[in-house]
């Protein structure tokens, strides 16, 4: 009985591992793996202060924290919720924009601008709180989902008036205040506002040019072709049809809200 149960568990784990490595897009897998690895390391080493976002780290010129703070978490609950958010929300976004563009966006303006807003708030409030966690990314993705960037996800919800969907996106971070009533609300709200502006195609200048992305993918095609579940610019354009990176321009979000 125990042997049979062990075999079933082993088969299930093997199936989940295969699904994880072969079905989920590359950037999503990398972020999830880094989150898991750093979560384990955090049990034994105090890495939150080194990777977390704080005014103290900025003064000490630890600029890497502008990019690393989503990958570490304070506790088990935030760790689990962060992973859940990544698996539920990130894959569709990556398929829509491609792996390279997704990396550029989530380690670029979608992450850095909210981080800067948080640091300014910390300076004004004379706070040295350390912010870690993937909450900013999750709220960004939720806002873009609500604003029809992914119109086939929840058609009933997306039939609501646009103003209502914008209000829902802005209210989402506020609902988390009872769990964490702190200055982090500034980062979360900034992430939502930036995502709303991006959804209306007013931040196209932050997107890497499609021609450059194609050049990079062509230059390193031998390496890229060997990487499982890498989403190329061409595949992203095909997936979204007339979405954020049109085939004829490969660098524009001109369609805005689908």
Swiss-Prot record:
Pfam families tied to this protein: Rhomboid
Membrane-traversing stretches: 24-44, 70-90, 100-120, 130-150, 157-177, 181-201
Any GO BP annotation: proteolysis
Membrane topology of the entry: Multi-pass membrane protein
SUPFAM superfamilies in alphabetical order: Rhomboid-like
Cellular compartments annotated: Golgi apparatus membrane
Family label: Belongs to the peptidase S54 family.
Name this protein carries in UniProt: Uncharacterized rhomboid protein C19B12.06c
